[in-house]
């Protein structure tokens, strides 16, 4: 084993347990973090937060959510443009809801459960969206950005964004659009649409 010396003079508490370690780069659009209960030093590609372990677990749950990734896809000036990671200042300025005691406990339970089953993150996503008080249509928008915008950035012309939608999806889109136009202009206006197969006469 090798002993490492911490030469940092300011904010040395970030290396003391318990602390949250945040990776500035992502894995398939998800940002990774971990709560450590032992002292550790790390390099410039990792960020550290020292604090109460319950709050650190809560932050880790929020950071691992699609809400966190969605926010930075839309607001970050470099991610998906010239760099494949976030800058420290961008992470520190992320708006995060202040939890109450019950929400802290729930976040800790989710965090502990994901330690044993990291792929079962449904509870994490639901918790994060509830914390931000997101409506159903806002959740759809978040999923679409991750599933299509990020996927296009990652896979380019192999992205699912280029796959032809199913007939049912076209019909659902038409019904939604017709409903919006009817609510906007009133029932007195008649709207109709046609679904073309092949090249559309436009």
Language model features by range: what are they?
Residues 1-104, 171-202:
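Polybasic, glycine- and aromatic-enriched phosphate-binding surface used to engage nucleic acids
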Residues 98-202:
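Non-catalytic DNA-recognition/assembly elements of restriction-modification systems
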